[in-house]
Amino acid sequence: MATITNNPDKEKALNLVLNQIERSFGKGSIMRLGDAARMRVETIPSGALTLDLALGGGLPKGRVIEIYGPESSGKTTLALHAIAEVQKAGGVAAFVDAEHALDPTYSEVLGVDIHNLLVAQPDTGESALEIVDQLVRSAAVDIVVVDSVAALVPRAEIEGEMGDNQVGLQARLMSKALRKIAGNIGKSGCVVIFLNQLRQKIGVTYGSPEVTTGGTALKFYASVRLDIRRIQTLKKGSEGEYGIRAKVKVAKNKVAPPFRIAEFDIIFGKGISQMGCMIDMAEHTDVITRKGAWYSYNGENIAQGRDNAVKYLEENLDVAAIIEKQVREKLDIASLSFAGSGNDDEEEFEAVEAEE
């Protein structure tokens, strides 16, 4: 064990108190950071390669994550893709459906193993957060998604009258619950994702009027906060709308540089376009080149137009695997367990506050 001080008496006293703390509170309760076997934060894939790179490798394990944005922006879709990725790796996933709006058919299309997905539909916010805490403490679950914070209604509000003015109940509930969850989540390595909605503050002249629900506790306890927005509706000739283009701003990141931007397509009925992410990053790293509407790989034209390029990769998975490997090497992310790719666009979103 490395020494902290050159004074032998101090070192002896320090080792004595460290041993005493470990006897009282358990092995690993205190340690020199340099002695830790694994200091790098492990990650799980988000389901979008562009977002994985923006996050520094993926969603960090043992952390609280908040995904917020307007309605129909892709929050639940992104969370379900993360669940699918965990299940593909042999992990256990849980979905706390406070909104009572989970669609099993759509979840299955995204790759979620609905037969082994743990689902809870609690009636009160207290019940939902207690379920989350127990799942985290079990250390048997790899990811828990709460949909959503706005639907975590305190018991006192449910049992009260519609006209009762109960200020700050949900904020106090979230603050108390997160204090408990945060203490256990690091030990279990579980990823806890809270989906959150946006509200508008009245009378705001300067700055963004948007606020997230549930008070400010989640803002502080979350290691990663993702602001997801719909920026474009995808249309194809006479077929009409077939998807959306989503942009995610990493508004907060304690484990990698924040404020990065990622974009990806969400296809209606299919979810996030993995090959679309691949095309974007391959073009960004010059693995695939584009001249006009033509995309070429290794000097040969492979498709005309982005949609056809995506279709080409979907039909030639062996080529897609080679391109993915080359993209990872170009971005120097080959060593990451769940490597992804992203967009370093520095466009700023306005800061979103939290509603009390």
Swiss-Prot record:
NCBIfam families: tigrfam_recA (TIGR02012). One of its GO terms (biological process) is DNA repair. Belongs to the RecA family. It is found in: Cytoplasm. Transmembrane segments: none annotated. GO terms for cellular component: cytosol. GO terms for molecular function: ATP binding; ATP hydrolysis activity; ATP-dependent DNA damage sensor activity; damaged DNA binding; single-stranded DNA binding. Pfam families: RecA, RecA_C. Keywords: ATP-binding, Cytoplasm, DNA damage, DNA recombination, DNA repair, DNA-binding, Nucleotide-binding, SOS response. ATP binds at G69, P70, E71, S72, S73, G74, K75, T76. This is Protein RecA. Can catalyze the hydrolysis of ATP in the presence of single-stranded DNA, the ATP-dependent uptake of single-stranded DNA by duplex DNA, and the ATP-dependent hybridization of homologous single-stranded DNAs. It interacts with LexA causing its activation and leading to its autocatalytic cleavage. SUPFAM superfamilies: P-loop containing nucleoside triphosphate hydrolases, RecA protein, C-terminal domain. It comes from Gloeothece citriformis (strain PCC 7424) (Cyanothece sp. (strain PCC 7424)). Coiled coil: none annotated. Gene3D superfamilies: P-loop containing nucleotide triphosphate hydrolases (3.40.50.300).
